[in-house]
């Protein structure tokens, strides 16, 4: 049983002898998903093992490794991995196609990835493209460090209309229902428990601010830094099409301990739409014109 799913282990042959392991058709499956392993594991760089995957959920790998609750990759991986000299100085590479690749429950698209093991840095170097709604794919290059205590990542992302839903996980203390797309260059790096973003993204998105129960749409460039997001005179609108301008910041430390200051120049915008609640001393529907400070 793996992650509450029953897998079938098929008959196979595994022989351990004189510092080497010969694997003949080690095969386990669940419905049409499977992992199949053939080859030899040893210190000899000429001895190679081959791993074939079909529709294996990436979430299994991260759950087994107990990497972090702050980053959650999902998607069904199909492809082949090769490894040689495993017991001394491993050389490993893989080519995978991952359907419905997602980060923190935000679907990013179809991922085509080439990866290889970097012995010196104890990480997986990757070169990947993500195909979604844009004719031009998003590109991801860099390295993932799966082994503790270094576990983390260092990725350069060239986003083309990339789904921004994954940010909802980090902003859930103040906002929800994040919808939209981003285009730009971003550096995504740090330990899994302390991730950072750095770059600039042209954003066409909306989100709901919990305390106001109001959706705002943003169509402008947002600047990202390890300390937070900066908004420089960006164009915003409410869901009824009334527009305004916003300056301010959303500060955080590794997406935690959020604090913010927004200065909004509103033109008859819906700035609050709350109902009676024991959590708030006031409620109502408010349209505002002028300067608003949040």
Regions found by a protein language model. Give the residues of each.
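Glycine/Thr-rich phosphate-binding loops that ligate phosphate moieties of nucleotide
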Residues: 290
